[in-house]
A protein has these predicted regions:
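Intrinsically disordered, compositionally biased repeat/linker segments
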Residues: 1-256
């Protein structure tokens, strides 16, 4: 059946459980959210949370076999230990501060994952494992910070924004995929690694560079670096059995 909660404080508090075989779950209001220990388990359903503070806080879980999960609002975020496991689904996070915070996990067999907003990023310990999916991160400060990992069998990874880059120990490892990083200072910093069997790697921006100890080992790939100072600095390596390597810009060079 359909389940609807509407009021100024439409929330599920401690120990609440909604279990149904088939249903539509709508939570709307000034503070429409699922708090600690909340569970909404259903075989098939659409889950919509809207409001000024529509978010899932610590230890939130929405398990479903098939479903569409939409979270919108001014502060739409997953806080610590947020988990959305599902067999098939579309996961959309939009808002001014649409991001995954500490220990966020989105695991599904097939899905489309879109995070948009002014500060759409993955912070420490973020993981998005999926068999097949499209991963899009857009915003003013779209970055992967330390220890970010996005393992997937097949996927397209797009990072764009003012400072779209991979910083220390950032890793994107997949079997097949297209990797696009664009923005003002688009670069791989110390320890940046992109490992893939097949892939197309495109880096565009004013400062699209590989800095010290950058490495991109692939079997087959197209590598394009464009920008005003598009170059490989010392210690940088691009190794591949077959590939097209294009470096363009005002100072497109490989340094010592």
């Amino acid at each position: 059946g359909p389940f609807a909660w509407t009021c100024n404080d439409a929330t599920l508090k401690k120990g609440r459980t909604i279990a149904a075989g088939v249903g539509v779950f709508n939570l709307t209001g000034q503070a429409a959210g699922i708090n600690k220990g909340r569970t909404m388990a259903a075989g098939t359903g659409a889950y919509t949370l809207t409001g000024n503070a529509a978010l899932i806080e610590a230890a939130r879980s929405l398990p479903a076999g098939t479903g569409v999960f939409t979270l919108t609002g001014n502060t739409v975020a997953f806080n610590s230990e947020a988990n959305l496991p599902g067999g098939t689904g579309s996961f959309i996070f939009t808002g001014n501060n649409a991001g995954l915070r500490v220990s966020r996990l989105l695991s599904s067999g097939v899905g489309s994952f879109t995070l948009t907003g002014n500060a759409a990023n993955l912070n420490r310990g973020k993981s998005m494992p999926a068999g097949a999916g499209v991963f899009t991160f857009t915003g003013n400060a779209v970055t992967f910070l330390r220890g970010r990992v996005m393992p997937a069998g097949v996927g397209a990874f797009t990072l764009s924004g003012q400072s779209a880059g991979l910083r220390k120990a950032s890793i994107i490892g997949i079997n097949a995929g297209a990797y696009t990083l664009s923005g003002e200072p688009v670069d791989f910093r110390i320890g940046g690694v992109l490992v893939a069997g097949h892939g197309s790697f495109v880096f565009t921006g004013n400062a699209a560079t590989f800095r010290a100890t950058r490495q991109m080992p692939v079997t087959v790939g197209v590598f394009v670096l464009t920008g005003n100072p598009a170059g490989l600095l010392n210690g940088n390596k691009l190794s591949g059995d077959a590939g097209a390597f294009v470096l363009t810009g005002n100072a497109a060079a490989i340094y010592v």
